[in-house]
Amino acid sequence: MSERNSAVLELLNEDDVSRTIARIAHQIIEKTALDSKDADRVMLLGIPSGGVPLARRLAEKIEEFSGVSVDTGAVDITLYRDDLRNKPHRALQPTSIPAGGIDNTTVILVDDVLFSGRTIRAALDALRDVGRPNYIQLAVLVDRGHRQLPIRADYVGKNLPTARAEDVSVMLTEIDGRDAVTLTREDSEGDS
């Protein structure tokens, strides 16, 4: 007979999450040349639920560091998922695109965790129905590997190699009341 126990490890605390968001904001400023007069209009679109508050925080940091205001919004991927047959009853989330739309802009999709790549593929499909940006980039707080699709992030806060059976959770103050990144491991113990 075996018994399963879970071990929860805190990988990033509140200060770590804050520093990581600041680092991603600096990378976005540098890569997009936001402070250049020739720069494309840049917007951050969060993927619900964790990507939305992350996009807002990144926009705040970008403005703090560069003086440039960046529009934020949200893109709902519910109807674009490839696993609707497995879980057909999902709550739709609002999609909010900044005024002026996404045509001829640089859109940075923001999500909390990058895993298989399927969520990002769904977000790309959703964006295609909204408009045609010049560039689409991806910013994630955590990249845990295990891609099933050829997707990679342009901006990564923390690379966390994990086992497929492990669970990475990003907690954000706006949703969970605190900032942290945890890893849950299922440990099996055999009974003799």
Swiss-Prot record:
Xref: SUPFAM superfamilies: PRTase-like
Motif PRPP-binding in this chain: 107-119
Catalysed reactions, as listed in the record: UMP + diphosphate = 5-phospho-alpha-D-ribose 1-diphosphate + uracil
InterPro entries the UniProt entry points to: PRibTrfase_dom, PRTase-like, PyrR, PyrR_bifunctional
Annotated protein name in UniProt: Bifunctional protein PyrR
Sample GO molecular function, one term: uracil phosphoribosyltransferase activity
Binding site for substrate: 49-50, 90, 111-119, 144, 168
Taxonomic source organism: Corynebacterium glutamicum (strain ATCC 13032 / DSM 20300 / JCM 1318 / BCRC 11384 / CCUG 27702 / LMG 3730 / NBRC 12168 / NCIMB 10025 / NRRL B-2784 / 534)
Family recorded in the similarity comment: Belongs to the purine/pyrimidine phosphoribosyltransferase family. PyrR subfamily.
Transcription listed as a keyword: yes
Record function comment: Regulates the transcription of the pyrimidine nucleotide (pyr) operon in response to exogenous pyrimidines. Also displays a weak uracil phosphoribosyltransferase activity which is not physiologically significant.
EC number(s) per entry: 2.4.2.9
GO biological process, one term: regulation of DNA-templated transcription
The protein's enzyme class: transferase
Listed HAMAP family: PyrR
Keywords: Glycosyltransferase, Transcription, Transcription regulation, Transferase
Keyword DNA damage carried by entry: no
